[in-house]
């Protein structure tokens, strides 16, 4: 990845963020997309070879189907993890 990306971490997930002068400014991409796939599979993603990880936003990972071009999103955290993260923020 390009060194112009900003590296950030939120709720234990490391992201690359597009620079402000990019048309994709602010878009977050996981540093390790395999983690996004593993999480999505755990939450019900079928046929992972048919999907591309695209980006993350609002605590969800977004995937695009290779064939249909449809998007699908999966939450990054379950209910228990969301509660833990909210207490950490306080």
Could you describe each region identified by the protein language model?
Residues 13, 17-86:
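Acidic, low-complexity, intrinsically disordered interaction modules
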